[in-house]
């Protein structure tokens, strides 16, 4: 099949590259000239495990190309996937201006039988509104919904071996075309769920909001564990081993971040409020997560006897989770911002996300370092803010000899308490009593 992706950000890029690898002829479009130039030279603008290998294979097989030009080549396309961003407006509502801009432009270049597939995360009802919008302009394209469920850090595996493929359609032609596109995965036994447009759109919001709820819940259980002496790791395992619940997203920490969970739960809350539904769960999760970075700073302050001003603090990990270079809505960045506002000197390190962090946050009291060891030199406390496996392998004995005060607060519970204490550190983790 001939497929085009409009928007070569995280979703469009991963989806387009893997679709090319699966045997389709793929064109990825983006307005960013520099990005397109780099992609044509096999240079990825994002970090994603194994994606560079698939990019190379797809390009060498001549099944993938990148462009910044809307051209007549689009007239031979069977399906156009819209994968542009849908950022939050001030009150949490999804901003669809990039979606409509993409729809406007492609509608002028594609053939009448081309299927427009909305892969961007959009509020329920959006596809029907787009159909009406196109009809008012004299177009009668089929429009389908096909939400993505890719996790940054494991997106390639998620695309190739998904739990399910969800499509929302309003006719058999659209369903048949999407079945053909996803045939390589369906033939492997992947569940292909067909529903209507609105339900498909809502599935994405409901899924992400439910996962965010699991994270907020286990974080609050960690707070209880601190008070009563329970073990949060054992609690997470004991709860997660129940197959009705599952073990994923039950790791206590500094809160959820990234480009999806915070945005999507806000958008879903905005949607239910528009329909005069008082969804207390969503509001509670949003509030709980918003307070989480501040709560982490309060724990740091307690360990430093309530005196933060002028302290030197090392922050190890800047991305919102391991396996990605994405610092959007990162709890680590939120924590650093709060600390800087309290006149703290911050020394920061991340194995992958350093450059993105530098673009996101600059301050006279914030220094970025090329190694964790350098960042820890002469600090009053070390904060593990992201669960990078590299941090487990650090020479902690060397770091112990360099710090001003041998104290660690592990916001991701990745280090071994006994090992750290044997070296000589005062070690505290989320869910343990301070």
UniProtKB/Swiss-Prot annotation:
Q: Give the E.C. number(s).
A: 1.1.1.22
- Tell me the pathway: Nucleotide-sugar biosynthesis; UDP-alpha-D-glucuronate biosynthesis; UDP-alpha-D-glucuronate from UDP-alpha-D-glucose: step 1/1
Q: A GO biological process this protein is involved in?
A: UDP-glucuronate biosynthetic process
Q: Which SMART domains match?
A: UDPG_MGDP_dh_C
Q: Which GO terms describe its molecular function?
A: NAD binding; UDP-glucose 6-dehydrogenase activity
Q: Where is the active site?
A: 260
Which reactions does this protein catalyse? UDP-alpha-D-glucose + 2 NAD(+) + H2O = UDP-alpha-D-glucuronate + 2 NADH + 3 H(+)
The UniProt record gives the binding positions of substrate as: 148-152, 204, 208, 249-253, 257, 321
Which keywords fit this entry according to its UniProt record? NAD, Oxidoreductase
User: Which Pfam family would be a valid example here?
Assistant: UDPG_MGDP_dh_N
Q: Where does NAD(+) bind?
A: 2-19, 30, 35, 121, 152, 263, 328
- PANTHER family reported for this sequence: UDP-GLUCOSE 6-DEHYDROGENASE TUAD
Q: Which family does it belong to?
A: Belongs to the UDP-glucose/GDP-mannose dehydrogenase family.
Q: What name appears for this protein in its UniProt entry?
A: UDP-glucose 6-dehydrogenase
Gene for this chain: udg
């Amino acid at each position: 099949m001939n497929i085009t992706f409009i928007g070569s950000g995280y979703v469009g890029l991963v989806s387009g590259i893997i679709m090319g690898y699966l045997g389709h002829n793929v064109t990825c479009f983006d307005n960013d000239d520099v990005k397109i130039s780099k992609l044509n030279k096999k240079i990825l603008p994002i970090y994603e495990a194994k994606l560079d290998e698939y990019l190379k294979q797809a390009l060498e097989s001549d099944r993938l190309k990148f462009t910044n030009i809307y051209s007549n080549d689009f007239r031979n396309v069977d399906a156009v996937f819209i994968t542009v961003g849908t950022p939050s407006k001030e009150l949490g509502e999804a901003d669809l201006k990039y979606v409509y801009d993409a729809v406007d432009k492609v509608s002028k270049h594609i053939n009448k039988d081309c299927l427009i597939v909305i892969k961007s995360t959009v509020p329920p009802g959006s596809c029907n509104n787009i159909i009406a919008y196109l009809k008012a302009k004299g177009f009668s394209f089929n429009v389908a919904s096909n939400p993505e469920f890719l996790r940054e850090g494991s997106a390639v595996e998620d695309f190739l071996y998904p739990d399910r493929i969800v499509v929302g359609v309003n006719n058999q032609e659209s369903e048949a075309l999407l079945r053909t596109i996803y045939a390589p995965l369906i033939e492997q036994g992947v569940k292909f769920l067909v529903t209507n447009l609105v339900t498909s759109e809502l599935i994405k919001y409901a899924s992400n909001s439910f996962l965010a709820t699991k994270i907020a819940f286990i974080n609050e259980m960690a707070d209880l564990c601190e008070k009563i002496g329970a073990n949060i790791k054992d609690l997470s395992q004991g709860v997660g081993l129940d197959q009705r619940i599952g073990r994923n997203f039950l790791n206590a920490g500094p809160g959820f971040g990234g480009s999806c969970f915070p945005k999507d739960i806000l958008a879903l809350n905005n949607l239910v409020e528009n329909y005069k539904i008082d969804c207390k769960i969503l509001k509670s999760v949003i509030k709980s997560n918003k307070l989480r970075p501040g709560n982490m700073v309060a724990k740091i302050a307690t360990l430093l006897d309530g005196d933060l001003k002028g302290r030197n603090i090392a922050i190890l990990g800047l991305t919102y989770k391991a396996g990605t270079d994405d610092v959007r809505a990162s709890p680590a960045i939120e924590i650093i911002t709060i600390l800087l506002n309290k006149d703290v000197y911050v020394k920061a390190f991340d194995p992958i996300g350093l450059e993105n962090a530098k673009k996101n946050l600059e301050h006279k009291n914030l220094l970025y370092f090329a190694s964790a060891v350098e960042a820890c030199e002469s600090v009053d406390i070390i904060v593990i803010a992201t669960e990078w496996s590299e941090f487990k392998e650090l020479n902690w004995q060397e770091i112990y000899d360099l710090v001003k005060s041998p104290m660690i607060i592990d916001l991701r519970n990745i280090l071994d308490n006994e090992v750290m204490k044997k070296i000589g550190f005062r070690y505290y983790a989320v869910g343990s009593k301070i």
